[in-house]
Amino acid sequence: HPLLGVELGWPELLARVQQSELLGFDSYWFSDHPLLNPDCWTRIAGLATTTRTIRLGTMVNCIYYRHPALLARMVSDVDGMSGGRVILGLGIGDFVPEFDQLGLPFPPTPVRQRALEEAIQILNGVWTDAPFTLEGETFRVRAAHIQPPPVQQPRVPILIAGAGEKVTLRQVAAFADASNFGPNPHTGNVLGSDAVRRKFAILARYCTQVHRPFASVLRTHWSPPVVLAETAASLRKKVAAITPDEHRFYGEHMVIGTAADAITHFQQLVDAGLQYFIVHTRADPETARILAEQVMPTLVPARQPLAL
C-alpha cells in the first residue's frame, strides 16, 4: 500500500522480524487494515512461535473490526503462544473508506470515543475470574469469561493512540498503559518538541486527577518513515524509491539522511519527554541496522526534567 509501507510476504516478514530481534529492538508492530494488509493478528500469531524475545504489537487495532470479547479471546491466545509478549494498541478508527468497504457504520467521533471505553471495560472484565456483563451503547456482553487468561497479568498492556486534549489524553490516563501519537493527521498531528511537551503537560494533569503517577504511562511516538544509509549513493537510491503518495502524506516529517541526522531528530523528541519510538523503516534492513547500532545506543534520557 502506498502509505502503509512495503508489504512483505511471510518468509520475508519472518526474516525481518528475526533480524530485528537479533539487533536488539524491543518490539515489532502491525497496522490493522484488513482489506489493505494481511491480518495483523494472524501475523502476530505466526511470529509468536517463531521469535523468542521481541514484543509484538498492533499500531493500532481498530475497536470496530472485532467485537471486544472476540478480541480478548484472540489476544489472550496469542499472548499465551508468545509467552507474554503482546502489546495491544487500540484506536477508534478514522479511515472512512475502510469502514464503508467492510460494511460498517462510521459513528461520530464522540460515539467512537465512548465505544473505546466500553471495549476496554470488556477486555478488562472478561480477563478476570468472574463472568462479566456490560450493556453498552455500542458493545454488549453477557456473562462472558475468557479462559485461559493472558499470560501477562493483570492484563496485556494497552496502548491508546491519539492526542486529543479533551478526551483521548484523559482516556490514556484513566485506562491505558501507554500513550502514542505522531506528527501527521492520522497520528495526532503533534508537530515539534513544544507540541509534545504540551501534550504531556495535559496528560500529567489527567493522571493527577485519577491519582495515577504520570511516570506510569509509557510515552510512545509513531515515527513516519525513516530512511538512513551509510553512503550518499545508497541514500539517493532509497530516496528515489519513495513514492509520490508517501511524499504527499508524510512530507517533511520523514527522517532522511545519516545516523547523525537521526540522532539529532530523536534526541530532540527524547528531550521533550518521549520514551519509546515505533519507527517506520520502509522494511529496509540497512535503516534498521543503523538505528540499532548507531542511533539507539547514542540517545540519552531527557536531559532536563519535564516541566509539568
Q: Model-derived features: where do they sit?
A:
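Active-site-adjacent structural elements that line small-molecule/cofactor binding pockets in enzymes
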Residues: 1-308
